[in-house]
Design a protein with these regions (language model features):
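N-terminal first-folded block
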Residues: 1-21, 26, 63, 67
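A generic structural micro-environment signature
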Residues: 11, 18, 33-36, 70, ...
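Broad gene-expression machinery/nucleic-acid interaction feature
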Residues: 22, 40, 74
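A short linear hydrophobic-aromatic micro-motif
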Residues: 25-31, 72-74
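C-terminal structural segments of small proteins and small subunits
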Residues: 45-80
């Protein structure tokens, strides 16, 4: 857990880099930029079919949920 914006940004930088490196997805912090207690991340991917998207996002969520440096409180999926 972070106790300052500097700590939060360090954790996010490492997490975003890990997700981008291990999975074929784009990741960005989309809200709560200046709130050290929380972060809102968006993970985006494109695939030939929905099953591939579901599989990748399930792996990403598992990665995030098993991380020890933060806690996933809520998730939301949107398909376009």
């Amino acid at each position: 857990m972070s106790s300052s914006l500097k700590d939060k940004r360090s954790v996010l930088r490492k997490t975003i880099h890990r997700l981008r490196t291990h999975y074929n997805c784009a990741v960005a912090e989309v809200d709560d930029h200046d709130v050290w207690q929380s972060a809102i991340l968006a993970v985006v991917t494109v695939a030939a079919n929905r099953a591939q998207v579901d599989s990748l996002l399930a792996k990403v969520m598992h990665d995030l949920e098993t991380a020890s440096d933060f806690q996933v409180v809520e998730q939301e999926l949107e398909y376009l």
